[in-house]
């Protein structure tokens, strides 16, 4: 990855609210399935904005920090996804998205961020990201002191 895109908590909340507004009316949804771990925080934000209490997870391992590896399903929510929103933080190459589509063919699959290779696999997303960009999510970062350039 040659570029980095830094996401702040404020940006994430703004994007999640924008996505939630597109998913109205909320009564059409039985619940949310968050893709662990990237979709957990966006899933909580959507659940709050839409007033949805039924939240489940599908746990898929596909990244080791910044290296993509073989998909492994650790836990899945039951059913075919009918009436459910499936949320992940991003769609990248589409590997996870293909697995999600196979597990939940009737779900409405959304992400906050989408890269070109995976974009056709989701029903909706908020932000376009170039394919060669690594996204730094706020839950992966800490706030640290940065000394002034002058050293004073």
Curated annotation (Swiss-Prot):
Kindly state a single biological-process term from the GO annotations of this entry: IMP salvage
**Residues given in the record as GMP binding sites:** 69, 92-96, 134-135
Q: Which residues form a coiled coil?
A: none
Recorded catalytic activity of this chain's protein: GMP + diphosphate = guanine + 5-phospho-alpha-D-ribose 1-diphosphate; XMP + diphosphate = xanthine + 5-phospho-alpha-D-ribose 1-diphosphate; IMP + diphosphate = hypoxanthine + 5-phospho-alpha-D-ribose 1-diphosphate
Q: Name one GO cellular component term.
A: plasma membrane
Q: What class of enzyme is it?
A: transferase
Top-level taxon in the UniProt lineage? Bacteria
Q: Which UniProt keywords apply?
A: Cell inner membrane, Cell membrane, Glycosyltransferase, Magnesium, Membrane, Metal-binding, Purine salvage, Transferase
Which residues take part in binding xanthine? 92, 135
Gene Ontology molecular functions: guanine phosphoribosyltransferase activity; hypoxanthine phosphoribosyltransferase activity; magnesium ion binding; xanthine phosphoribosyltransferase activity
Q: Identify the metabolic or biological route this protein is part of.
A: Purine metabolism; GMP biosynthesis via salvage pathway; GMP from guanine: step 1/1; Purine metabolism; XMP biosynthesis via salvage pathway; XMP from xanthine: step 1/1
Its principal location?
membrane
Tell me which InterPro entries the record gives.
Answer: PRibTrfase_dom, PRTase-like, Xanthine_Guanine_PRibTrfase
Q: Which coenzyme or cofactor does it need?
A: Mg(2+)
| Entry binding sites for 5-phospho-alpha-D-ribose 1-diphosphate | 37-38, 69, 88-96
Q: Which PANTHER family match?
A: XANTHINE PHOSPHORIBOSYLTRANSFERASE, XANTHINE-GUANINE PHOSPHORIBOSYLTRANSFERASE
Please state which protein family the record places this protein in: Belongs to the purine/pyrimidine phosphoribosyltransferase family. XGPT subfamily.
What this protein is reported to do is described as:
Purine salvage pathway enzyme that catalyzes the transfer of the ribosyl-5-phosphate group from 5-phospho-alpha-D-ribose 1-diphosphate (PRPP) to the N9 position of the 6-oxopurines guanine and xanthine to form the corresponding ribonucleotides GMP (guanosine 5'-monophosphate) and XMP (xanthosine 5'-monophosphate), with the release of PPi. To a lesser extent, also acts on hypoxanthine.
The record's NCBIfam families line, in alphabetical order, gives:
PRK09177.1
Summarize subunit and interaction data from the UniProt record for this chain: Homotetramer.
Q: Give the protein name, as stated in the record.
A: Xanthine-guanine phosphoribosyltransferase
Q: Which organism is it from?
A: Escherichia coli O127:H6 (strain E2348/69 / EPEC)
């Amino acid at each position: 990855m040659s570029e980095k895109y830094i996401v702040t908590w404020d940006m994430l909340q703004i994007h999640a609210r924008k996505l939630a507004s597109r998913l109205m009316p909320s009564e059409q949804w039985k619940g949310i399935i968050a893709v662990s771990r990237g979709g957990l925080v966006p899933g909580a934000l959507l659940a709050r904005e839409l007033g949805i209490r039924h939240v489940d997870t599908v746990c898929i391992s596909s990244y080791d920090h910044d290296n993509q590896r073989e998909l492994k399903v650790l836990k899945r929510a039951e059913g075919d996804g009918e009436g459910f929103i499936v949320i992940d933080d991003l769609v990248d190459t589409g590997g996870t998205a293909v697995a999600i589509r196979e597990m939940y063919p009737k779900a409405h699959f959304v992400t906050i961020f989408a890269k070109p290779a995976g974009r056709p696999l989701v029903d909706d997303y908020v932000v376009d990201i170039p394919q060669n960009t690594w996204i730094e999510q706020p839950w992966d970062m800490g706030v640290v002191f940065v000394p002034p350039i002058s050293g004073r």
